[in-house]
Swiss-Prot record:
Regions crossing the membrane: 18-38, 43-63, 73-93, 102-122, 148-168, 216-236, 250-267, 279-299
UniProt GO cellular component terms: plasma membrane-derived thylakoid membrane
Alphabetized UniProt keyword annotations: Cytochrome c-type biogenesis, Membrane, Thylakoid, Transmembrane, Transmembrane helix
Taxonomic lineage of the native organism: Bacteria, Bacillati, Cyanobacteriota, Cyanophyceae, Synechococcales
Organism: Prochlorococcus marinus (strain MIT 9301)
Superkingdom classification of source: Bacteria
Entry's Gene Ontology BP terms: cytochrome complex assembly
Stated name of the protein: Cytochrome c biogenesis protein CcsA
Gene giving rise to this polypeptide: ccsA
Keyword Transmembrane: yes
Pfam families referenced in this protein's UniProt entry, alphabetically: Cytochrom_C_asm
Amino acid sequence: MILDNFFKNLIYEPVSVLGLLVFYFLLINLPISLGAVFKKKSSFAVRLITILVNLLITLQLLFRWSISGHFPISNLYESLYFLAWGITLGQLLVEREYQAPIIPSIAIPIELLIVSFACFVLPEDLKSSSNLVPALRSSWLVMHVSVVMLSYAALIIGSLLSMSVLFINKNKPLQIRSSSTGIGGFKLSNSYPVNDLVESIEFSHSEELDTLSYRSILIGFVLLTLGLISGAVWANEAWGTWWSWDPKETWAFISWLFYAAYLHMRISKGWQGRKPALLASTGFLVVLVCYLGVNFLGIGLHSYGWIFG
């Protein structure tokens, strides 16, 4: 009987059912990932469930695309799941580079919060699909919005990795040899003989996480830059102006400046250790305000609607 109802709902409401399945699998994955941290050993089960979650979100978004007839990123519900998809994908890519139990343990709670917000907090009218206004019926929708959302995912992952570096080293000095290129990134090389530089240097746990954080933020910054440029071109085509300084645009520019400053301090000034980790961790709040905070204003071309109205 329960299975009959499940499959019946899956046929008639596939987007909602798949969204709930994502929530329950993340809920199962959370204690497993935390247990792996205490055991200090990466869990294959956590990675397997994360892959399943990513595939379920992919299927959910494809169903929504088929039902609505447009790329599924036009309202807050869709964009939240797209963001969760990006973070789960980023988590898997990071774990492919460096397997550490702390990586899923910091990513999965954020994924669960995002999906919970989409499932249980958003009102029904913000979950349902609707026809796009003429200005949004453009191929720029896919290019601009998807790239910006992927930049948010990469920046969030970078911030979470920096938080993990700070957490691991909360009661001890933080000395990190960085992979950041540039003037500051190569200061360490002066203290090593030439022969030693030929051999690979084994990085510590914190250094590996810091390197992954830096790379994630660099990727996110590049994507955010492309998103801002594509958005400006689209705005000029649709409304005849490159930039209107609405709340979302303003905060996106603030986010861009914030991460530009972070990368500048790491690459050119040689920032290492606790300072860049603190700055990158603060970036999580910057992205949160940029993505969700402006919706509470309920104004602007980019607002997904007044959440509690």
